[in-house]
């Protein structure tokens, strides 16, 4: 299925169609504030495995992240969040960042790293957040497979390449070419893991 959604005013009917698909174990491709990504309900084990098959990766080694609606939503999946970390996140989210944080018991085992951490996002994208809000649960955030990122900015090309592998491709306009900036907040300091779309000028210091 190929669905058009208005970036600033996503149609509720189409959002409902997407969330119904996710609830039944479906996989989608959807826009974020960076690149288009693969997504599914984080509590649908088989859907996560399907995403990993599409990407040709081992689910237990994938270090997948997921999208939350807001800070209240995010806090359920974080074991501990010291005040300095919370303030730092508030200064950068919603935005093009993935923060690695200590995982709570609410995080499905398949999405936890060996260090019991998880990557979390609150993208500055109304479509992605509307899907999460309507679903009532976070959705997976995984990059599309392959090296040609520039081919994955146009949802029509994405549909041609991946339409048969997923249940829905969401057209939310032309996407970006640069993934999110990844910051590890599990140690005594914030560590830049991957430089991406989000500017990172935070002075590293102890939390």
Kindly label every feature range from the protein language model.
Residues 1-207:
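Active-site-adjacent structural elements in enzyme catalytic cores
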